[in-house]
Regions:
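Membrane-cytosol interface motif
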Residues: 130-144
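Short, hydrophobic/proline-enriched secondary-structure or compact coil segments at domain edges
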Residues: 43-57, 182-184
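Juxtamembrane amphipathic/hinge helix adjacent to a transmembrane helix
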Residues: 45, 50, 219, 226-267
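Short, non-transmembrane cytosolic segments of multipass membrane proteins
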Residues: 1-41
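Acidic, metal/cofactor-coordinating or nucleic-acid-engaging core segments within structured domains
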Residues: 166-175, 179-185, 194, 215
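Alpha-helical transmembrane spans
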Residues: 52-124, 248-320
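Phosphoinositide-dependent membrane-docking surfaces
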Residues: 135-136, 147-172
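Canonical phosphoinositide-binding patch of PH/PH-like domains
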Residues: 185-223, 228-240
Length: 320
C-alpha cells in the first residue's frame, strides 16, 4: 500500500489519517492478503460482483442494553422516588418538581431513541462492487439521533472510476487509557478530479490498519482481475441464531461455526488479548443477548428490484 503524508482530496476529511493507493495505480499481485479478519465482512463474491458487509463496524445491541438498563433503573428507583416525594416536588418546591420531570422525560426519550435506532437499523448495509457495470452500489440507512428527521433507506450508485480510498483515524484519552480506531473510507470524486462529492465508510472500528489496507487491495484486485487473482475466502455466516449472538463478543469460546472459524485464524498475539478481555464476560454476555434482540428486530436489507438485479448480474437496468 502506498500511503501519503498529505491528502490529495478536497475537501479534506476532518479525521483523515492517510490516503491509500490510487485506484488505477499498479497492483502488486505478490502482496499478501492474509489478515485473519479479511473475510469477516465478505458476504458474496463471484465473477460478476463482490459484496462487502458493514456489520462489523457497528456495535449492535448497545442501544438495547442502554434502554433496558435505564428502564430497570427508572422503574426501581426514579419513578418510585417521584411518587413517594410527590408533595415535596410539586407543592413545596414546584420548580424542582418540574425540573425533575423534565430531566426524567429527556432521559426516557434518549434511552428509547438509542434502543429504537438499534432495532430499526437494517441487519446489514452492504456495498456491492460489480465488474461488468464497473459501478459500486451502496445500501445506506439515514438516521440521526441528534436531528429529528425521517429515518430511511437510500441507495447510492457510483462509477468505479470515481472511487478512491483513505484511512480515517479517531483517538480519545480518558487520562488512564488511550483509545484509537481506524476506518476505511471510500472517497467518491468528480470525474477526472480529486474534488470529493461523497464519502462512504466501508469498514471501521479497527484498532490497527492492516486489515483495512488489505481490504482495499482485495477490492482493487477483484475489479481488475476478478476472483481468479484474489484469495479464496469463505463468506461469513449471515443468519441470526441465539447461540452465535450470545457469544458474538466472545467468539473465541463460541461453540458455533463462527467460533470454530475464529479459533482457526487466531495468532499468538490474540491469546494475551483474550486473557485480558475474557474477565469482562459479565458485560459481553448481556451485550450478546441484546445483540440477538436487536438483530431479530432489525429488518433485512432489501434492494430495489431493478438495482438488485443490475448489481448482481451486471446488466444495467432502466431506473426511474
Amino acid at each position: 500500500v502506498t500511503a501519503s503524508s498529505r491528502t490529495r482530496f478536497t475537501p479534506k476529511n476532518p479525521s483523515w489519517y492517510e490516503d491509500l493507493a490510487a485506484r488505477e495505480s499498479e497492483i502488486d499481485l505478490n502482496e499478501r492478503l492474509d489478515s485473519p479478519a479479511l473475510d469477516e465482512d465478505l458476504n458474496h463474491v463471484d465473477e460478476n460482483y463482490l459484496e462487502i458487509s458493514r456489520t462489523s463496524s457497528v456495535i449492535r445491541g448497545l442501544g438495547v442494553l442502554i434502554g433496558i438498563m435505564y428502564f430497570l433503573f427508572a422503574v426501581s428507583f426514579l419513578f418510585p422516588m417521584l411518587i413517594e416525594q410527590w408533595y415535596d416536588y410539586f407543592v413545596t418546591a414546584p420548580w424542582f418538581g418540574l425540573y425533575y420531570c423534565t430531566m426524567l422525560l429527556g432521559a426516557t426519550l434518549a434511552a428509547s431513541l438509542f434502543a429504537l435506532h438499534d432495532c430499526l437499523l437494517p441487519r446489514d448495509t452492504p456495498v456491492r462492487f460489480n465488474r461488468n457495470t464497473r459501478k459500486i452500489y451502496v445500501y445506506e440507512y439515514k438516521a440521526s439521533l441528534r436531528r429529528l428527521q425521517r429515518w430511511r433507506t437510500e441507495i447510492k450508485i457510483y462509477d468505479w472510476d470515481q472511487v478512491e480510498a483513505e484511512i480515517a483515524k479517531v483517538s480519545a484519552s480518558t487520562g488512564k487509557t488511550y483509545v484509537v480506531r481506524h476506518e476505511l473510507v471510500l472517497v467518491i470524486c468528480k470525474a477526472g478530479s480529486n474534488e470529493v462529492i461523497d464519502r462512504i465508510s466501508l469498514k471501521g472500528n479497527d484498532v490497527t490498519v492492516e486489515t483495512l489496507y488489505q481490504l482495499w487491495s482485495y477490492i482493487r484486485r477483484f475489479m481488475a482481475y476478478g476472483p481468479a487473482r484474489i484469495p479464496d475466502l469463505k463468506a461469513r455466516v449471515q443468519g441470526v441464531s441465539f447461540v452465535s449472538s450470545l457469544f458474538h463478543f466472545m467468539p473465541y469460546i463460541s461453540p458455533t461455526e463462527e467460533g470454530r472459524r475464529f479459533r482457526s485464524k487466531m495468532r499468538w498475539l490474540d491469546y494475551p488479548i483474550i486473557f485480558l478481555t475474557i474477565w469482562f464476560f459479565w458485560i459481553w454476555l448481556p451485550l450478546g443477548l441484546c445483540y440477538y434482540i436487536a438483530m431479530k428486530c432489525a429488518p433485512e436489507p432489501r434492494w430495489p428490484a431493478e438495482v438488485g438485479e443490475e448489481s448482481r448480474q451486471g446488466k444495467e437496468a432502466s431506473r426511474s
